[in-house]
Amino acid sequence: MLEWKDNVILLSSKPFGESGIIASVLSEKNGRYKGFVFGGNSKKKRATFQKGNLCTAHWKSRTSEQLGSLKIELIKSTAPNIMDQPIQLSALSSVCDVFDFILPEREPNRKLFNATIKLFELLKLSDSINYSWVKGYINWELGVLSELGFSLKLNKCAVNNDCKNLAFVSPKTGRAVSYDIGLPYKNKLFILPKFLGGNYYQDNIHEDILNGLIITKFFINMNFFKNSHLPSSRIRLQKQLEDKLSKV
């Protein structure tokens, strides 16, 4: 018998059978796992299986090839704390949906687990006026890219190693480009936000945030969703922020 007990983040749940569900979770010590939850679709337990909830889980299976079963108990809900903040709710859904698609099964990554818990706490502390949490979300996406082998190099120019006059990011290499080098090709490059090390084009903090979202969306889509579709929650998040910040 194989089994583990651990803290988990609930990524998704799908009805299975009369009252059960298939739950997908990110475990702190064991990585992403799926398992069958008996009675998980009952009215009594439905609130436990909301995306982003922090829970304790007990997974068991006779063999490593089997799906296994999960017993899950709620520790702390996430979504109810931001129910009146639709953009933050989209961010929460985006995190869970992206992870549910791209994370390899049963490969531990405590760093991503901890980073996600911190991001959810940041979402709960945010409000409809302060959008500084979006920087945290962008850095979370950069961390995901890095942990899964697609790190962006934003600390120096890919051509001349300049560290002080960075202005762009190459979509081909994921590396920073200095202002002088990149200026003739600026229409083919991304603008590097100030909070990620850029020194130009940051007259508007809201534009800075949107430029960061454009960069991470592009590289996540290119590296993980080339043969699929970016989750609708991630697309919705970007559209909501574009609409909101363009009016501020």
Model-derived regions: residue spans:
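Non-catalytic alpha-helical scaffolds and adjoining flexible linkers that form interface surfaces
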Residues: 1-21, 26-248
